[in-house]
Amino acid sequence: MNRRRRIYEGKAKILYEGPEPGTLVQFFKDDATAFNAKKHEVIDGKGVLNNRISEHIFTQLNRIGIPTHFIRRLNMREQLIKEVEIIPLEVVVRNVAAGSLAKHLGLEEGTILPRSIIEFYYKADALNDPMVTEEHITAFGWASPQEIDDIMALAIRVNDFLTGLFLGIGIQLVDFKMECGRLWEGDMMRIVVADEISPDSARLWDITTNDKLDKDRFRRDMGGLVEAYQEVARRLGIMNENDTPRPSGPTLVK
């Protein structure tokens, strides 16, 4: 069996060379990290759940005409994706005050914001991913003004879709993080949604109880992370009651 070439390894995922030109295999790890990896733990089953949830969301986004890098899920831990040039920005869309926004602006957690707020963070672990403005982004050439417009338009569309999706299953979308990349198709380039969208990258609260169904359970030592992710998957209709993720190692694509 030939080992695939590892292209990149991040905190929660590994990218391998894909079976066809222009493709990659995205592997979801069980690693849970917080505070820029200062807190780290391996939680069995987390990667399987994130793979399934992100697959479901990206499939729906593709279906309604929001372009993404997602092609298809390969197995319990891996997806086939289009190779894109990642823009070094984390795009955060906030609907409710929580996390750093509540802390920095002195807002009570759970306060509904006057409107959705889009923030940009420069992807640099050594700098703790600092918040940046559109001025920084264009001055340093991370993205052009037109690309920023495209990214913001995508962020608004994704937020509208996710808000409705989760509202329909009794979950409030507090905020979420997404990444974008440049997808080259011949001489044409377009901005697409990349990375993942899962409880690792979104704050999800039960509408009735305000129970946290996301990675804040790990950040705040609340426990029950896998159970919370399972509940999200169950409500989305992508995992049965008895379909519990089992620990497993990397699965190679033959």
Curated annotation (Swiss-Prot):
Reactions this protein catalyses: 5-amino-1-(5-phospho-D-ribosyl)imidazole-4-carboxylate + L-aspartate + ATP = (2S)-2-[5-amino-1-(5-phospho-beta-D-ribosyl)imidazole-4-carboxamido]succinate + ADP + phosphate + 2 H(+)
Pfam families in the cross-refs: SAICAR_synt
Gene3D superfamilies: ATP-grasp fold, B domain, Phosphorylase Kinase, domain 1
A molecular-function term among this protein's GO annotations: ATP binding
InterPro entries noted in UniProt: SAICAR_synt/ADE2_N (IPR028923), SAICAR_synt_PurC (IPR033934), SAICAR_synth (IPR001636), SAICAR_synthetase (IPR050089), SAICAR_synthetase_CS (IPR018236)
EC number: 6.3.2.6
Gene Ontology cellular-component annotations: cytosol
Keyword field: ATP-binding, Ligase, Nucleotide-binding, Purine biosynthesis
Pathway info: Purine metabolism; IMP biosynthesis via de novo pathway; 5-amino-1-(5-phospho-D-ribosyl)imidazole-4-carboxamide from 5-amino-1-(5-phospho-D-ribosyl)imidazole-4-carboxylate: step 1/2
One GO process term, biological-process aspect: cobalamin biosynthetic process
Domain of life per record: Bacteria
Protein family: Belongs to the SAICAR synthetase family.
HAMAP family cross-referenced by the UniProt entry: SAICAR_synth
This protein's name: Phosphoribosylaminoimidazole-succinocarboxamide synthase
Gene: purC
